[in-house]
């Protein structure tokens, strides 16, 4: 992965990725509906990093804007930060990113399932299903600021416990 010498703000990072994605889609001459889905997915692909445990792991100031990248740290520093963060082993921010966008219909545009699939399969961890259910993904009191824990838990149960995510993956594979 990339080495960042300085902290990178989450909103700046996602906006930069969305803009690069838009330019690339335009240069490739992709169909507008596909370009829109890619750009929306890029804009929200790291929303799960707003989880307060993830921010703690990155060393973010709880009163400052959310971080996407922590800046340069040694392997030992990164390991200690992960251990102190209360994130369970195997927790993936892209799963929470997909959940947060699913819980915010205004972020998905017309191609909801495609946007969610791209987000959930980002970072080279594309998977047909996630190993973790709603109880593993969320922890009350650590949800991103401005989100409703109960609403997120309800949506997470639908997506990851009941099986909507698996259906979504199957439908968008065709």
Residue positions per predicted region:
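Divalent metal-dependent catalytic cores for phosphoryl transfer on phosphate-bearing substrates
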Residues: 29-174
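Short, small-residue-biased leader/transition segments that mark boundaries at the very start
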Residues: 3-4
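Phosphate-binding active sites in nucleotide-utilizing proteins
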Residues: 7-23, 37, 43-44
């Amino acid at each position: 992965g990339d080495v960042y010498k300085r902290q990178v703000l989450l909103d700046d990072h996602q906006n930069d990725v969305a803009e690069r994605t838009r330019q690339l889609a335009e240069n490739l001459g992709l169909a507008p509906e596909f370009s829109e889905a890619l750009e929306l997915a890029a804009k929200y692909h790291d929303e799960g990093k707003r989880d307060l445990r993830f921010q703690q792991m990155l060393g973010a100031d709880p009163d400052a804007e959310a971080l996407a990248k922590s800046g340069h740290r040694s392997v030992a520093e990164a390991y200690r930060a992960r251990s102190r963060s209360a994130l369970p082993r195997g927790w993936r921010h892209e799963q929470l990113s997909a959940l947060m966008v699913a819980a915010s219909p205004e972020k998905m545009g017309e191609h909801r399932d495609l946007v969610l699939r791209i987000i959930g399969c980002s970072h080279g961890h594309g998977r047909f299903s996630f190993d973790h259910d709603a109880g593993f993904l969320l922890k009350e009191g650590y949800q991103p600021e401005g989100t409703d824990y109960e609403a997120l838990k309800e949506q997470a149960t639908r997506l990851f416990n009941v099986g909507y995510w698996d259906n979504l993956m199957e439908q968008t594979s065709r």
